[in-house]
Regions:
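A conserved mid-domain beta-alpha-beta active-site/ligand-binding segment of alpha/beta enzyme cores
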Residues: 25, 37, 43, 47-114
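Sequence/structural signature of outer-membrane beta-barrel proteins
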Residues: 7, 21-29, 62, 127-133, ...
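Outer-membrane beta-barrel pore domains
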Residues: 95-106, 114-211
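Transmembrane beta-barrel strands of outer-membrane/channel proteins
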Residues: 18-24, 53-59, 122-126, 162-168
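Flexible, solvent-exposed coil segments and beta strand-coil junctions
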Residues: 16-24, 86-92, 125-129, 209-210
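Short loop/turn motifs that connect adjacent beta-strands in outer-membrane beta-barrel proteins
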Residues: 4-17, 45-54, 113-119, 153-159
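Transmembrane beta-barrel strand/turn architecture of Gram-negative outer membrane proteins
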Residues: 35-58, 145-156, 163-168
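Outer-membrane beta-barrel translocator domains and adjoining extracellular loop/strand segments
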Residues: 28-36, 66-70, 132-137, 174-179
Length: 211
């Protein structure tokens, strides 16, 4: 369900959307024949009111493929289920301790205000590289994220909209990774991975927000 769809019986005041995609990466730059899993779900309240509030959660994972160092990274049904449910698995120690594959969670909180021939959208996006994932604003890396505002209008023909965004990635849940063995996180080094060293790019083009 790519578009916001009214929840039955609530007259459009509650809308939902979500889906699941599974893709293959064909560039074969470092890990050959790696795969991408993406699922998302979201809800919006407000409907015909001038103010709407929406929340979305996205989970994306790189998994499978063949590494020049580690060989087969798991390309069977069980490996897919590990990626789908963020479970540990595989033959490598990092995948046994954490989760099989390279996982990212993203949360998006959006406030929409609509008027006569104009609309203002203010949004906040937060990324999670480590678990446990908490609601946006309560995680270990709350200072990091993308904040934006988008204004569209139909009054004047010479401009249709204006967007401003601010990105911060310096907190990274603190400088140390798993310093006590109980609180997992820190030194997130977003978009990098020791196994999938080509990172989140496809044919040398960044997937997602560039830094």
């Amino acid at each position: 369900i790519d578009q916001w769809t009214a929840f039955p019986g609530l007259y459009g005041y509650l809308q939902i959307r979500g889906g699941i995609r599974n893709m293959w990466m064909t560039d074969n730059m470092y890990v050959e024949k790696a795969m991408i899993h993406h699922k998302w779900i979201g809800g919006k309240i407000g409907g015909k009111f001038p103010v709407n509030l929406s929340y979305e959660f996205h989970h994306v994972a790189q998994w499978g493929g063949f590494s020049p160092v580690y060989g087969d990274l798991g390309n069977n049904w069980n490996a897919f289920l590990n990626a789908l449910f963020v479970r540990s698995g595989g033959s490598m120690a990092t995948d046994q301790i954490n989760a099989q594959g390279n996982h990212i969670g993203s949360q998006i909180l959006t406030l929409d205000i609509k008027g006569n021939k104009w609309k203002v959208s203010a949004y906040w996006q937060n990324i999670s590289e480590d678990g446990p994932i908490k609601f946006i604003g309560f995680g270990m890396n709350t200072p990091d994220g993308l904040w934006g505002i988008n204004i569209t209008q139909q009054h004047w023909p010479f401009i249709s909209g204006l967007t401003y965004e601010f990105v911060q990635t310096t907190d990274q849940s603190g400088p140390f990774h798993d310093k006590d063995g109980f609180v997992f996180g820190g030194n997130d080094s977003y978009y990098t991975n020791s196994i999938y060293q080509n990172g989140w790019n496809y044919w040398y083009r960044t997937i997602g927000t560039p830094f």
